[in-house]
Structures are given as structure tokens and as C-alpha cells.
A protein has these predicted regions:
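HTH-adjacent hinge/linker in prokaryotic transcriptional regulators
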Residues: 54-104
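C-terminal regulatory/effector modules of DNA-binding transcriptional regulators
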Residues: 122-125, 132-301
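N-terminal "mature head" segments of proteins
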Residues: 1, 22-25, 41, 55, ...
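Extreme N-terminal segment that seeds HTH/winged-HTH DNA-binding domains in transcriptional regulators
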Residues: 1-31
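Short alpha-helix C-terminal cap/hinge motif
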Residues: 98-119, 200-201
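Short coil turns linking two alpha-helices in DNA-binding domains
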Residues: 40-49
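Short, hydrophobic-biased segments on the C-terminal half of alpha helices
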Residues: 50-51, 128
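A short alpha-helical element within helix-turn-helix/winged-helix DNA-binding domains
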Residues: 27-39, 53
Length: 301
């Protein structure tokens, strides 16, 4: 009987820990009756499980009689140990720009005390595929790419960071004076952003799409293999040296969406969504990113 009680209490502890990860210090907690209903448990067993979490130092609750119970302190790492999240792995773009490095460094800093790792991979499609298959816990993509994936089932937009947090600006790159004569446009089929923006920009135009690697784009224009490519401009002086020019992309909100970083989780991974809400201070993350971009701080990820 005692062994059965311990097993049931463990299940209730896991459910309570998942709930508490979504709360913030100072919040009024649900009543014990409400929690018991959510845990599908008795009031007594739910109280015992809550006491266990308190005794372990995972939480501290202040009980105010008729005014309810309030969460005063919480240890995210301790709570994580009760929900089978021993570490977090995030699929992230290759860190080839300071903006990406700042994002990676800033996000990791938010998970202080929680084992947090990156799997750097090129192409949003593969990052999302690995997320859906359960290989990773979350994935960083642009809002533009995210909106296309969210039409599928199984994904949740868990964190939005605002414009120009993913890339600075995509532009149309072509040889000088030839922006009106584009017949062949380069396209990396692994890049959801580039595919969508190319379709938006050229619309129904009779333009041939040429498959290439994103990082070969500029050289392929210079060689004459393609006439243009939509590309994230990082260094203007590089364009000048190569004899190519950039034209800003305007007149469609999707171009701005491509500059915003978002974090996706699986739709049923409530602990990960709650964890992001609980530990990420968006203002601090973005300030960290900007310090890395400006050179005030070295990235650490």
C-alpha cells in the first residue's frame, strides 16, 4: 500500500511541477481542490505532493488563509528534476553573424542553472523536422518561416522577439545596373525564408530558379551563374568589393517577418512552453544580444 502511495504521489508531483513552471513568484496559486482535480487525485495526496516540493526546496508557498496561497520562491532547476527535463537542446541557425551569436548567447544566459545546449544546423526545414521528431526541445526560426510551419499541426509559437532580432535585412543582390534584367535567381531550397521571399518578390514573373547553397550566393552572381539572389546583407563593403549592388525589399509585410526571431516547441510540450515563459526575460535577452552585436560583450554559447 505504501509503495502504491509513493508511486501515485510521484505522478502528482510531476503534474504539480509542470503547473508551477508556468507560474511566477508573487502569483496566487490555484486552490488545493482545483489542483487535486487537475491532478486527478485526492486532496490529501495533492497536499502531500505539494509539501514534498516545498521540503525539497523547489518552491516556497505563503499561505494567507481566505486570501489564498501565494508562490514566494521557486527553483526552476529543482522543478525541472520532477518533470523529466534534465537538459534543454535548441536547434539554432549556424552562428555566422553577430546577430545570431548574440541571440544564441542571450538565450543561453536566460537558462542560468539549467543545462542548455545548441544543435547548430543550416535550414529551418531540418530544424523543424528534428523538433517534430522529438530530437530537440525547441527550434529558433524566423517568424516568416514559423507562420508557414504553423499551418501544420504539432507546433507552438512559444517566444517572439520582434523585428530585426533574427537578421538585419534581406535585400535583392544583383550585378550593378542589372536589377531590371533578372532571368535566373539563385535559391537554396533548404531555406524556407529565401523560398518564400523569392516567390513574393518575383511573383508570376518568368524567372528561372537555380538551386545553390546560400553561402555561395554572392560568388555565383559574380561568376554569372545567376543574375540575382535574395540575401541577408551583413557587410555592405563586401558587396562593393565584388561589384554587386543591393536593393531593399519593401511593400510586403512578409519581408519584415523574415527579420524576426521566434522559438517553436512541440504543441503538446507544455513543460517546455512553461519553462520558456518562466525563465526568459525578453528585455534582458535582447539587451544581451545588442551588447554582443556592438562588441561590448563576447558571446558565450
Amino acid at each position: 500500500m505504501r509503495r502504491t502511495f509513493i508511486k501515485k504521489e510521484g505522478v502528482v508531483i510531476t503534474t504539480l511541477a509542470r503547473y508551477l513552471l508556468g507560474e511566477k513568484c508573487g502569483n496566487r496559486l490555484k486552490t488545493i481542490d482545483e489542483l487535486a482535480t487537475e491532478c486527478r487525485s485526492s486532496v490529501g495526496l495533492t497536499q502531500a505532493a505539494l509539501k514534498t516540493l516545498e521540503s525539497s526546496g523547489a518552491i516556497r508557498i505563503e499561505r494567507r488563509g481566505r486570501n489564498g496561497s501565494y508562490l514566494v520562491e521557486m527553483d526552476n532547476k529543482a522543478l525541472l528534476s520532477h518533470v523529466d527535463i534534465n537538459n534543454v537542446v535548441c536547434a539554432m541557425p549556424l552562428p555566422y553573424t553577430r546577430l545570431y551569436e548574440g541571440l544564441a548567447s542571450g538565450l543561453k544566459a536566460q537558462f542560468d542553472g539549467i543545462p542548455f545546449y545548441y544543435a547548430h544546423m543550416r535550414g529551418a526545414d531540418i530544424r523543424v523536422e528534428c523538433l517534430l521528431n522529438g530530437v530537440y526541445d525547441m527550434a529558433v526560426v524566423s517568424r516568416l518561416a514559423a507562420e508557414s510551419y504553423l499551418t501544420q499541426k504539432g507546433l507552438c509559437l512559444a517566444l517572439e522577439l520582434g523585428p530585426h532580432t533574427y537578421v538585419g535585412e534581406h535585400q535583392l543582390i544583383c550585378r550593378k545596373g542589372e536589377s531590371a534584367n533578372v532571368k535566373r535567381v539563385g535559391l537554396d531550397n533548404r531555406s524556407a525564408d529565401q523560398k518564400i521571399m523569392t516567390d513574393v518578390f518575383f511573383g508570376g514573373s518568368d524567372v528561372e530558379r537555380v538551386d545553390l547553397s546560400y553561402h555561395e550566393s554572392l560568388q555565383r552572381i559574380v561568376k554569372g551563374d545567376v543574375d540575382a539572389v535574395i540575401w541577408n546583407v551583413v557587410a555592405e563593403n563586401e558587396l562593393t568589393m565584388l561589384g554587386v549592388e543591393a536593393t531593399p525589399l519593401t511593400d510586403d509585410p512578409r519581408f519584415l517577418q523574415a527579420t524576426e526571431a521566434v522559438v517553436l516547441t512541440r504543441v503538446d510540450d507544455y513543460p517546455m512552453q512553461q519553462l520558456l515563459r518562466a525563465v526568459v526575460d525578453k528585455h534582458a535577452l535582447l539587451a544581451h544580444q545588442q551588447r554582443v552585436v556592438s562588441g561590448e560583450q563576447e558571446p558565450s554559447y
